[in-house]
Amino acid sequence: MKRFFSLLLIFLTLSTLLFAQEDDEGFYEDDVYVYAPNGAGDQFLKITLGAIFPLNFKGQLSTGGKASIGYFRFLSEYLAVGGELSASYNVSIGEKVLVMLPFTFGAMFQPYIGRFEFPVYAEIGLANQTWQNMEIFPTFVTKLSAGAYFRITDSISIGASTDFFWIPQWFKDSSKNFNGLFESAEIGLRYHF
């Protein structure tokens, strides 16, 4: 009886091979993969260091320093939104220090060619300014930026950028209004994730 069940089990197992057939169509994959360095949902942190140049102070301020940290998230392959916090200083001819802390939000458009990326930013925000123990907050800030970065790996890119700041000061007495214009040149590191 045991032999009968063993032979029946072997016979039924091998009989399935009689009904097996080959797939003549072969393997076909419908998806096409195209490499793009950035896609919707990708993010990056950036850190920059550089110099800031006063443009319309007629020799009253010297070249200063600037550092910033920012976060951006891609909405598509080319468009991202995010914000940036900067800190800069300039020294006057009277050895007084102008300190500015702008916090901006905006959008970035970034075309690329191979591993080279060319971000262009437009941002607006508020700044805290300190000058001769006077603190001015909030001050309106607009910033336009452009740069060129090289993607070393999928996670790291390095490059250079320039920022143009317009920081107006408006008072009740309009004769005292002033438009502060600054340009910066920076080197930067970006971490993509």
Question: Where do the model's predicted regions map?
Answer:
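Sec-dependent N-terminal signal peptides
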Residues: F4-L14
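C-terminal segment of classical bacterial N-terminal signal peptides
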Residues: L14-A20
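Short glycine/proline- and aromatic-enriched beta-strand/turn motifs that initiate or cap beta-hairpins
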Residues: A20-L75, G188-F193
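Sequence/structural signature of outer-membrane beta-barrel proteins
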Residues: G50-K58, S88-G94, L126-N133, W166-D173
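Gram-negative (and chloroplast) outer-membrane scaffold detector with strong preference
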Residues: G65-K143, F150-I156, G188-F193
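Internal, hydrophobic beta-strand segments that form the core of beta-sheet-rich folds
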Residues: T162-D163
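Solenoidal tandem-repeat scaffolds enriched in leucines and small polar residues
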Residues: S184-E186
